[in-house]
């Protein structure tokens, strides 16, 4: 819902801080910029989508997303979808906008992600990488895709390139293999 305050139009904005495991370098505390889609969902089952937005997160992991169909004071789950990471949800109970602003940081504490479904790199928490086929789990099917593309020296903006060096190789396979071994899956309400 777009609010009007003394003639000024206030579009609800979510200021999001998030990091993706394969793209984050804890030594430089920088990440590679990439596109992310964020859904705001009802906090009651079946968790219907209320609104969505797309943005690019910057090298610090920050993204600012404008929404049209949300209201202040109503709790929403924040559901983050990235091209090659496990989809993540905000903590149990949801979050609400106040004065058309919601600031949310997934990186400082694992409790900010539903089911604590993040991995710690350095001092920050990141979404797990490796779900290249977006089936909700890092598993053999993801490893097969990465392995096949690595063996053909695939280059470019590919879901299989987990560290975004524009080359699918053993570095990407290692990240996915570790997460498959640990049975990493989406944890949602």
For each feature predicted by the language model, list its residue ranges:
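Structured interaction patches on ligand/partner-binding surfaces of diverse proteins
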Residues: 1, 56-57, 85-117
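Low-complexity, Pro/Thr/Ser/Gly/Ala-rich linker/spacer regions in secreted
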Residues: 3-14, 126, 187-189
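Short amphipathic, basic-aromatic surface patches that mediate peripheral association
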Residues: 11-31
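Beta-strand signatures of extracellular beta-sandwich domains
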Residues: 35-41, 77-79
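Short, acidic Ser/Thr/Gly-rich low-complexity loop/linker segments typical of extracellular
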Residues: 44-62
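Short Pro-Gly-centered beta-turn/loop motif in secreted/extracellular proteins
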Residues: 61-76, 84
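Alpha-helical segments with a strong preference for the paired helices of cellulosomal dockerin domains
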Residues: 110, 114-119, 132-159, 163-189
């Amino acid at each position: 819902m777009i609010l009007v305050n003394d003639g000024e139009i206030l579009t609800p904005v979510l200021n999001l801080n998030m990091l993706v495991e394969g793209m984050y370098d804890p030594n430089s505390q920088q990440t590679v910029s990439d596109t992310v889609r964020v859904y705001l969902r009802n906090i009651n089952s079946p968790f219907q989508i209320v609104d969505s937005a797309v943005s690019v997160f910057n090298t610090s992991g920050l993204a600012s997303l404008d929404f049209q169909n949300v209201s202040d004071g109503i709790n929403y789950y924040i559901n983050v979808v990235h091209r090659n990471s496990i989809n993540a949800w905000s903590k149990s109970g949801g979050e609400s906008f106040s004065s058309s602003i919601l600031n949310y940081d997934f990186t400082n504490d694992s409790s900010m992600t539903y089911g604590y479904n993040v991995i710690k790199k350095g001092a920050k928490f990141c979404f797990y990488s490796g779900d290249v086929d977006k089936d909700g789990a890092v598993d053999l099917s993801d490893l097969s895709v990465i392995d096949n593309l690595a063996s053909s020296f695939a280059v470019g903006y590919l879901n299989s390139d987990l560290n975004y060096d524009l080359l699918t190789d053993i570095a990407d396979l290692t990240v996915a293999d570790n997460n498959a071994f640990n049975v990493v899956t989406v944890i949602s309400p």
